[in-house]
Amino acid sequence: MGTPGTSAGALFLSSASAPSRKRAAGEAGEAGVARSRQRVLDEEEYIEGLQTVIQRDFFPDVEKLQAQKEYLEAEENGDLERMRQIAIKFGSALGKISREPPPPYVTPATFETPEVHPGSAVLGNKPRPQGRDLDDGEAGEEEEKEPLPSLDVFLSQYTSEDNASFQEIMEVAKEKSHARHAWLYQAEEEFEKRQKDNLELPSAEHQAIESSQAGVETWKYKAKNSLMYYPEGVPDEEQLFKKPRQIVHKNTRFLRDPFSQALSRSQLQQAAALNAQHKQGKVGPDGKELIPQESPRVGGFGFVATPSPAPGVNESPLMTWGEVENTPLRVEGSESPYVDRTPGPTFKILEPGRRERLGLKMANEAAAKNRAKKQEALRRVTENLASLTPKGLSPAMSPALQRLVSRTASKYTDRALRASYTPSPARSSHLKTPAGGPQTPTSTPAPGSATRTPLTQDPASITDNLLQLPARRKASDFF
């Protein structure tokens, strides 16, 4: 069975030949390995090793689930040879009979979870040969002797090619930044060197300071000080005096079965006896005694109540777990055979009555008639407006109707606009009456004579002098 970790085991076996003092240091010493001492692996090898460690520590049942899946597939395909290989490979771990009573619950897994007892090694943490035949027994024993490192130790010891190349790029960028801003770090380096020289104990001949400053340098010089730059933060020195953190994976499971049947049965019986003694002689809210007296016993057995037949046992239920062959129907509240047990009034929208339905029908019909009348009136007005022109007069119209249409057509046409687009004779600035009517005298009337107010203005006078715009005044005109 090819599972992740086949080549990862060879990786850890090759690194297992390190001196024993490295293994004795433990995770605390390995976590602080410098980045330069990390071993660079291929991307596929690094991911496979990381996947193996994570699967072993956090998902130990994945291997058994994969074996179970392959066993079921082989059984479905009738591959007896594959079934035999899986049974031989996992038979030693699955064939052990536990002497402790089984748990009160049954898990759906076919392969049992290995039980962990105090003083015994964790079975899930032991690496097994994956994807190998039984002939490689020696290699499997050698692999079982060398435990795989934890996740933190693996990340501190190994890195991928992408991570290593990224670190190199960051180092090169940092060196370029220092070279570009050498003036920023030169004074800081000189100060650190001078301070280091002052801390060293010179010989007796050089203890006399010949050229010294007026005061003692107590202020530490820093290029990026906290006044002009954002502070970099205080180093967390508190973690240096604490024990290194470690993930204890065995704490996620019980060392022994906490739900023992014998212990649980005795505790339940004791709790039931105490509860019955506490409720002895008390009356519930329904007026009945909480623990009624026992019925007479015959041969150690008490009487049981006569079973009452439940109606509709053999009938088809309202809902089944089968497939729905058509659109499901909504069950109304009145059609449901179950009685509503919720006390108090319930909200329900009643169906409209016959009178209300008749009123709505009449209102809809009246509204439809009104809309039809309105549409017909609008259509007639549109047709009339389109035909109210002297050129559009029908010869079938009577003379009186033609004069009426000619007289009313002037209300819907703009004579001034028509005159601006058509040539006209010499215009006069005097006021005139509409065509066909009596003309207004051009001379000034006598004081006592009656005058007539012009009804309309000359249509040609509306568009006269439109382009004769007044000249814009200059600044010199105001002085």
From Swiss-Prot:
<feature type="modified residue" description="Phosphoserine">
    <location>
        <position position="394"/>
    </location>
</feature>
<feature type="region of interest" description="Disordered">
    <location>
        <begin position="415"/>
        <end position="479"/>
    </location>
</feature>
<keyword id="KW-0539">Nucleus</keyword>
<keyword id="KW-0832">Ubl conjugation</keyword>
<keyword id="KW-0007">Acetylation</keyword>
<feature type="compositionally biased region" description="Low complexity">
    <location>
        <begin position="7"/>
        <end position="19"/>
    </location>
</feature>
<comment type="subunit">
    <text>Identified in the spliceosome C complex. Interacts with FRA10AC1.</text>
</comment>
<dbReference type="GO" id="GO:0007399">
    <property type="term" value="P:nervous system development"/>
</dbReference>
<keyword id="KW-0597">Phosphoprotein</keyword>
<feature type="modified residue" description="N-acetylmethionine">
    <location>
        <position position="1"/>
    </location>
</feature>
<feature type="compositionally biased region" description="Low complexity">
    <location>
        <begin position="433"/>
        <end position="454"/>
    </location>
</feature>
<dbReference type="GO" id="GO:0005634">
    <property type="term" value="C:nucleus"/>
</dbReference>
<feature type="cross-link" description="Glycyl lysine isopeptide (Lys-Gly) (interchain with G-Cter in SUMO2)">
    <location>
        <position position="145"/>
    </location>
</feature>
<feature type="region of interest" description="Disordered">
    <location>
        <begin position="1"/>
        <end position="38"/>
    </location>
</feature>
<keyword id="KW-0508">mRNA splicing</keyword>
<comment type="function">
    <text>May be involved in pre-mRNA splicing.</text>
</comment>
<dbReference type="GO" id="GO:0005681">
    <property type="term" value="C:spliceosomal complex"/>
</dbReference>
<keyword id="KW-0507">mRNA processing</keyword>
<feature type="compositionally biased region" description="Polar residues">
    <location>
        <begin position="455"/>
        <end position="466"/>
    </location>
</feature>
<comment type="similarity">
    <text>Belongs to the ESS2 family.</text>
</comment>
<feature type="modified residue" description="Phosphothreonine">
    <location>
        <position position="389"/>
    </location>
</feature>
<dbReference type="Pfam" id="PF09751">
    <property type="entry name" value="Es2"/>
</dbReference>
<dbReference type="InterPro" id="IPR019148">
    <property type="entry name" value="Nuclear_protein_DGCR14_ESS-2"/>
</dbReference>
<keyword id="KW-0747">Spliceosome</keyword>
<protein>
    <recommendedName>
        <fullName>Splicing factor ESS-2 homolog</fullName>
    </recommendedName>
</protein>
<keyword id="KW-1017">Isopeptide bond</keyword>
<feature type="modified residue" description="Phosphoserine">
    <location>
        <position position="398"/>
    </location>
</feature>
<dbReference type="GO" id="GO:0000398">
    <property type="term" value="P:mRNA splicing, via spliceosome"/>
</dbReference>
<feature type="compositionally biased region" description="Acidic residues">
    <location>
        <begin position="135"/>
        <end position="145"/>
    </location>
</feature>
<feature type="modified residue" description="Phosphoserine">
    <location>
        <position position="295"/>
    </location>
</feature>
<feature type="modified residue" description="Phosphothreonine">
    <location>
        <position position="3"/>
    </location>
</feature>
<feature type="region of interest" description="Disordered">
    <location>
        <begin position="95"/>
        <end position="152"/>
    </location>
</feature>
